[in-house]
């Protein structure tokens, strides 16, 4: 065991405690990464607030970058000293989804309580989201890391680990956006801005950003949005349709607010789909009219 510092959550809604924990050495296809930077995702905040429950104590953090400092005996293609991004996407490589080209939704469960970290007393400690990156080091599966050039700063690289791949992935993988289609992105935060970038890369015709902040809408245009709509109005979906000239082919909800999911189908055109990215609190629900969506072949799909 190696003793390291980590920010540990002992009680939901309370400040994290920086304290010593024990980290075991990597085994089999695992890699130890000494972290150079870790970003704070809203998911980390939601977990720490208790929005989704879970085991405590826990170490959160899942957007990280650093140097490989040790490897398990079955690791191939990575060496000590390599610079890597660490993600929460852990893939077994042999379940139905992994075999079918969707490793981001691997079906093999990961027991974070039985992971590589313990309290200094030897008690269970949750490695949240298979990362536990609010720490000096992590031990993760090789499938969770991607080698990066040494020229990329760790602080910048850490943002690739969730915000970028979540936003761009929602557009490219979940929506399968085609050139010339029109999209609405609700929420111009980190994930929303990357959904906007993804839509631009995919060749979208009109990209409408919707947010409560004028400042964020201006930033969204720098990232590729063609139009900005304030969500503070009574019917922002009408403003979005006016900007596009029709309903959207895809609406990306990047905020974890149930009321926004209630409104999302209103932005759609015929055959459009709502892509669900933002995650509300556990136990919350949303409502929509199935008859309206069925009549014009609309749909809803989740995106991790």
Enumerate the language-model features and the residues they cover:
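Glycine-rich beta-strand-centered segment in the early N-terminal region that forms part
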Residues: 24-38, 48-99, 104, 149-151
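NAD(P)H dinucleotide-binding glycine-rich loop of Rossmann-like/cofactor-binding domains
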Residues: 23, 92-186
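Glycine-rich phosphate-binding loop and adjacent beta-alpha segment
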Residues: 204, 257-304
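Residues located in well-ordered beta-strands
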Residues: 5-7, 17, 22, 34, ...
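A short acidic, Gly/Pro-enriched loop at the edge of an enzyme's catalytic core
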Residues: 239-249
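Residues in the short beta-alpha loop(s) of Rossmann-like NAD(P)-binding domains
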Residues: 12, 213, 280
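Mid-domain Rossmann-like dinucleotide-binding core that forms the NAD(H)/NADP(H) cofactor-binding site
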Residues: 84, 143-145, 149-234, 238-239, ...
